[in-house]
């Protein structure tokens, strides 16, 4: 029997022993398959090749066994475990390799039972996106067992890791699964029969014979992804699926029990990417979404997100990614190993070696001031065009031309470097060659190179030139360099912003710049950047305290107007970089949102709840004034500097209480 469609998800069902045929450690895989003709989802099984005992031991390492007091050893053990899991799924035969290329059109050959996939043939390059499906949305609340906070005082690992070491657990919980307009509520007190009846509203249950055993296939009716909010505690998430798994298989006692093993960032002592995977049950994608209460992503975005993984869920590591070939030869010579590209980092992204860029730790601070005009050149789709010309269509996420998807593009780029070395180097080399050519053109125009952000935003400074002359020259330089280096006919969209007579950059825990002064985003860094730009521009020849007072009061008015606006104040932080106050749940093991507290620690702040009373508004004002003070120190004499400090103290005394009024 032949069936046309595409694989939407692939996982392990279990590893079992075929006692009758004396075949041991046989992995059974399950594939969630979208049939093209009926547009319906089906679950098929694949019989894998027998494992050796060593590989099985690495896969079966328990959480308790990984909780070592040597943190680096714990991290290494988890790396070995996910490497073994990924290798099992990706390298257990050519058939599984084909099925792990999600949304690629396939024709599968089924066995006589219509249950087992025996072979698969690729029958197209254009991704077959299941756009008529809808995601399952998980929401959950619960209570936790009390934990002595003295166990959490040290900073050697994340708070989540320390909690798990000391037996942190969920006492009770309630959750709901929502598909379209169907919402099903569950409680930890539900019986197995009640759970199965509820689950059958959105999942098909079927018991089938396979390899001399009975297996239970749980197939979503019209979904291949489950979404949960970034701010959902990962311990609650684990509890939900452990509960569902236990209750379902307690009812279906006669079947071969499916695995249900959680892999998430809290299993690493220093945290990991915000990604989750269950080996076994459930057989669908679990995706973390920011601010899910207010914005449910559409199916197209979910497909792009999955394609950007380049294979399995990111938490399963580099071995869970495909080696993607390059679809065109470069006309310019690639550098050899001795002259390989030097890649520096700024804002956690790779940038050209020709740019001035920063390698910052959590407490590093970088400042730049200039009396020159600053130009910010943005090429929002340059990465998309480069990837489109080098990545095979079947592997390329269908990125929109909208610049808001730059974060997804950058994540896709970063994942290419682990297995798709030639492709990653080709894209980076073309980008580096283009940036180098653009830099030389800017130098000929007597413009100074400052930095590159996120591979597509270029900061430059220039003296005494009319912007009506400079901007067309910059656009011409971009277009000529692009056409010459990349040989891509479509030119990147060009955006250029001029900030006259004021150029500054401040980078520490956050980014302030005159380049943000024209942004319409509602965030304190934008307001602070506008204030600093106005002060620097108005006081180039002398320090006028009347003007900086007016600008300061304008800034305070905006701060006060956003007093209760959570998104205005929160920042994102990497796990284990800063000291974080105690909070309920496991919420700091991946990148998280927080605000600064009165005692200098971060306070975990979710997007969907009211702003914490512990926020220290003074911190944000002081940081802004600190940047302005550094500018005063670089520009004026000791007398003005002393007067500025007195003015600064007075402003704080007169205004800070306004932010704390209810």
Curated annotation (Swiss-Prot):
Database matches in Pfam families: Herpes_HEPA
Primary subcellular site in the record, as a coarse category: host cell
Role noted for this protein: Component of the helicase/primase complex. Unwinds the DNA at the replication forks and generates single-stranded DNA for both leading and lagging strand synthesis. The primase synthesizes short RNA primers on the lagging strand that the polymerase presumably elongates using dNTPs. The primase-associated factor has no known catalytic activity in the complex and may serve to facilitate the formation of the replisome by directly interacting with the origin-binding protein and the polymerase.
Domain of life: Viruses
Alphabetically ordered keywords of this record: DNA replication, Host nucleus
Subcellular location field: Host nucleus
Lineage: Viruses, Duplodnaviria, Heunggongvirae, Peploviricota, Herviviricetes
Protein's UniProt name: DNA helicase/primase complex-associated protein
Assembly with partners or alone: Associates with the primase and the helicase to form the helicase-primase complex. Interacts with the origin-binding protein. Interacts with the polymerase catalytic subunit.
Record InterPro entries: HSV_HEPA (IPR004996)
Biological processes, Gene Ontology terms: DNA replication; viral genome replication
GO terms under cellular component: host cell nucleus
Transferase is among the record's keywords: no
HAMAP family: HSV_HEPA
Family to which the UniProt record says this protein belongs: Belongs to the herpesviridae HEPA family.
